Amino acid sequence: SGEIIVNGEKVVYGQTTTKRYIGYLPDVPEFYPFMTAAEYLHFCGEITGMKRTENEERCKELLELVGLGNETHHIKGFSRGMKQRLGIAQALLNRPKLLICDEPTSALDPVGRKEILDILLAIREQTTVLFSTHILSDVERICTDVAFLNNGVVGVQGKLSDIKTRYRSEEYQLETGNDTDMLILQQTFPNMQQIGRNQ
């Protein structure tokens, strides 16, 4: 629990005043499959009330940014990575102050992951990017500040460089769920030392 402040305004569930500051990319974005990327973005711009010329310019700018500027196929034929890139373009349409991404690189191949991370790096100067991930190399590549959750509670939070310095170690502690897991670890890492056993 707690409060969320975006651009100086408190976020209140059910109220729309802060929504204009926020863009959101879900883990698996959904689109109208019969549209092209350009048609879909224009449609979203119309729904939000953008003026025609502004809509056209912004859509062109965003499609170029995410590498879909020359894409003319319908969305139904897009790869997962292409859909993620279109999702980022849609989330940036209203020039948000905060972009929230839920697992933006999950289930992507290495090339797709790199493309998404490159886009997120490129837009860091325009907006604050908050994203969740289990891929620590992605965190190291683009994050300046991090928060590690443990069972839904923030365990460690701060500048990534400070956390890496504070927790630097040549030792690692692993907890196993059962004796079989422990046996596998001992066979894989013969120099491993067992320091305790929970009953």
Regions found by a protein language model. Give the residues of each.
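Catalytic Walker B motif of ABC-type/P-loop ATPase nucleotide-binding domains
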Residues: L99-D102
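Hydrophobic anchor residue at the start of the ABC signature
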Residues: I88
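Conserved ABC ATPase "signature" region
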Residues: H42, E46, T53-N70
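Conserved ABC transporter NBD signature motif
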Residues: G2-Y13, T17-T18
